[in-house]
Structures are given as C-alpha cells and as structure tokens.
Amino acid sequence: NGASASAAEIVSGSLQDMDRAVLVGQRSFGKGLVQSPRELPYNGSVKVTMSKYYIPSGRCIQQMDYSHRKADGSVGAIPDSLTSVFYTSKGRPVRDGGGITPDFKIEEPETPTMMFYLMTDFILTDFVADWSQKHKKIASPEEFEVTDEDFEAFKQYAKEKNFTYDRQSEKLLKNLKEVAKFEGYMDNDSTLFNSLEAKLTPDLERDFDRNKDQIKKLLTSEIMKRYYFQKGELINSLKDDDVLDKALEVLGDPALYQRTLEAPEKAEKTATL
C-alpha cells in the first residue's frame, strides 16, 4: 500500500517483473532513489541522491520528480500520462514512475475527519484504560470482538468528556461564506448558507452511529494493544482484512493465479477455453 516504500517496493516489483508473484493491495509509495547522508558544520546533515533503483523490467519506481521543480521550488509526482510502459518476463505491461501497482487493487475505505481526532486524542486510550479495569481477562485475539454495549459505552464516555472535532466541510463552508460576503451574495442567500451550516454542524451522536464499524475497529485495536501488544493487534486485524481475503482467494484458485501472470492476449484465450 502507500506505506510500502523502498526495499518492499523493490522486492515486490522484482517478483512482479519476473512473473513470480501476484500482488494484492494498493499502489506503493514510489521511493526509487538511493540517498547517502553527509555531515555538515554545526551538527547539520544533508541527504544526497547518489543513484536510482531499477528493477528487472528496466523501470524505475520513483514517483516524485525532483529534476523538475515548480516556480515555488516544490516538486510534484510524475503524472500517469508521462510514465512509460515496460513488460514483465511473460509480456505483461507494467508502468514506471509511480510505485508498484498491484495485480488486484483493493480500495482502502476513506477515513472520516472524526476518526483522525479519535486516533490522535487521548480519549480512546483513556476509555480503554478505564474499560480494562472492569475486564481483567478477555477472549483471545482470534476470537475477541467489541460488542455494541462497548461501543455505546464509548460514545457516552465521549459525550461526558466533551469530545469535539472539526469537519473539513465546515471549514470550507466558512471560507465560502467569506467569499460570498465579499462578492455581495450573502444578503440574498444567507438563509441558504444558514441551512447548509446547520446540516454540517458536528453531531456526535449521528457521526458516531454513522462511523460505528470503523470506531469499533479502533476500539478493538487499542484493546488488543493493551492486552496482547502489537502481535495480538495484528492477529486480530487479520480477521477482517480485505487484502488478505483476496490473497487467499487467488492462492486458492490456481487457474486464476496462472491467468493473472500471463500476457493479456494469452490470458483472454485461456479464459475462453
């Protein structure tokens, strides 16, 4: 996925280029540069790019184009339209300039703004600390699940602690109102803006229920870390992992596995047989 970089990309990309593995997940980060640190005066240092990584098909996985900078000095990713096509050992087309694209893409669900606040606020860890005092023992990582009762208890705890969060839509609406006021539209359309603002105002009860499944996953993760540490958290997370499920599906279907590794023309012929 997007957190996979450097060595992970080189290994997975090489296996893909040699048609020795089927990749499942999201596109990787795209770090294809070799950098070496150099010391500077006054305890400073700088990383100097020494070379680039190229994998068996001849492609480079580097995503950010540092050779072409914008007017403000910033850099951008190489657009897909400017990437080149390369071929695996069996003739499957693959592209450079943007990390490793898996053979089976599994989209990651979007994370609402509220979830970021829950993950960075101490309210989650504080609740689990209290919860653990009432639950000296819990089920194994393979069997443990957060109940609806636990979810409701956490929601009530958040209310009592006056948990608050900002929403991007609310910020954008505020900016839009300022622009509308500057351009003279607020006098005529203030009622419309007020109505929209009311709908976009954070509602903890509504937003908790709307994101119930993701919040229960967060709670489960925090509880697992407290009782079974990182290993237990990982074992528990595999119970509901779309990437793992797809990988097991592909591994359990030899025909699909082989067809995925074939060149497009041959794969089409095989599928029709």
Predicted segments, located by residue:
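Cleft-lining beta-strand/loop regions that shape enzyme active-site pockets
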Residues: N1-P41, K52, N236
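Extracytoplasmic
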Residues: A5-S6, M18, V24, P41-V48, ...
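Short secondary-structure transition/capping segments
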Residues: G13-A21, T49-S51, R69-P79
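Soluble periplasmic/extracytoplasmic beta-strand elements of cell-envelope proteins
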Residues: N1, S14, V22-V24, S45-K52, ...
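Short, positively charged
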Residues: K31-Q35, I55, I61-H68
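Conserved functional hotspot residues or short segments at active or partner-binding sites
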Residues: C60-I61, D65-L273
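Alpha-helical protein-protein interaction elements
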Residues: G2, A21, S45-V46, I78, ...
